[in-house]
UniProtKB/Swiss-Prot annotation:
One of its GO terms (biological process) is translation. Part of the 50S ribosomal subunit. Forms a cluster with proteins L14 and L19. Belongs to the universal ribosomal protein uL3 family. The gene is rplC. InterPro entries: Ribosomal_uL3 (IPR000597), Ribosomal_uL3_bac/org-type (IPR019927), Ribosomal_uL3_CS (IPR019926), Transl_B-barrel_sf (IPR009000). GO terms for molecular function: rRNA binding; structural constituent of ribosome. The keyword Ribonucleoprotein applies. The lineage of its organism: Bacteria, Bacillati, Actinomycetota, Actinomycetes, Mycobacteriales. One of the primary rRNA binding proteins, it binds directly near the 3'-end of the 23S rRNA, where it nucleates assembly of the 50S subunit. This is Large ribosomal subunit protein uL3. Keywords: Ribonucleoprotein, Ribosomal protein, RNA-binding, rRNA-binding. It comes from the Bacteria. One of its GO terms (cellular component) is cytosolic large ribosomal subunit.
Length: 217
């Protein structure tokens, strides 16, 4: 069986109680339904993968090349497309074009990796962006309390090294949180309750995949 995955929408966080009446913070993810639109093979594409689509969209907003891809698969256009890489070509036997994937691809207690786009913070200084300590609050410090300090030498090296941590745009990055636990699968509502927090804003697109470091299938 190939490594499983599904596209979904982060709905927000809540809390539930486990069998020991302990409070468990969970993130609610509307998982799917996804539809398989293409299966890639090494002979034709050079690698093994399955392409899945998710989300409603007006056909008028889809360009003709993409519309042709959906028509070839025999499905209505969807808003989002993603690929799940497969370990080997034999894993593609678990999928077929037009197949629908729902939250039931996962089970209670499964370990997953969740990928999303982190919240944008705008332009941020080094204390917020990189956790710099800042400078003294007193003892002669004047108007430098949140400044980063020196960014390098003078004549030597005569330049600023690449990768030097500075102020700049913070957030809106592709982030993956690994080894989260699926607390419960609500198949009736197509919802996953994932223990803990996941990246991104409410309403954001997320990809939920089997945890790679645990060898989940």
């Amino acid at each position: 069986m190939a490594r499983k995955g599904i596209l979904g929408t982060k709905l927000g966080m809540t809390q539930v109680f486990d069998e020991n009446n302990k409070v468990v913070p969970v993130t609610v993810v509307k998982a799917g339904p996804n539809v398989v639109t293409r299966i890639r093979t090494p002979e034709r594409d050079g690698y093994s993968a399955v392409q899945i689509a998710y989300g409603e969209i007006s056909p008028r907003k889809v360009n003709k090349p993409v519309t042709g891809q959906f028509a070839a698969a025999g499905v209505n256009p969807r808003r989002h497309l993603a690929e799940l890489r497969l370990d080997d070509e034999s894993a593609a036997a678990d999928y077929e074009v037009g197949q629908e994937l729902t939250a039931e691809v996962f089970s209670d207690g499964a370990y997953v990796d969740v990928t999303g786009t982190s919240k944008g913070k705008g332009f941020a200084g080094t204390m917020k962006r990189h956790g710099f300590k800042g400078q003294g609050a007193a003892h002669g410090a004047q108007a430098v309390h949140r400044r980063p300090g020196s960014i390098g030498g003078c004549a030597t090296p005569g330049r600023v090294f690449k990768g030097t941590r500075m102020s700049g745009r913070m957030g809106s990055d592709r982030v993956t949180t690994q080894n989260l636990v699926v607390h419960k699968v609500d198949a009736a509502n197509g919802v996953l309750l994932i223990k803990g927090a996941i990246p991104g804003r409410n309403g954001g697109l997320v990809m939920v995949r089997s945890a790679i470091k645990r060898g989940e299938k």
